[in-house]
Amino acid sequence: MTCRIEEYTEAGQSPFAHWFNRLDPVTAASIDRYIRRMESGNFSNAKPVGQGVHELRMDFGPGFRVYFGMDGQTLVILLGGGDKRRQDAEIAAAIARWQRYKKAKV
């Protein structure tokens, strides 16, 4: 199964890109590899965190996380990113974004 990866946007801005673009190039490349694994259907490092939002956990650094929702079986919506230190706040923000995404689809 292959998945399509898209970024959630608010007013033309991507919260995921805002976070990702501030990372150093080596870290960004490593995180991109994890995202590409999801694109090829490998969700082994992902777990649900509530209300339809999932967390992609990285096995390096300060516990990097990428938050996403699944729109159907093959569309992944990137909602944001962060690390273990701000995990609770990032999860809450991702859940709010996911709810706005679903509401806008209706």
Show the residue positions of the predicted features:
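Short beta-strand motif preference
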Residues: 65-69
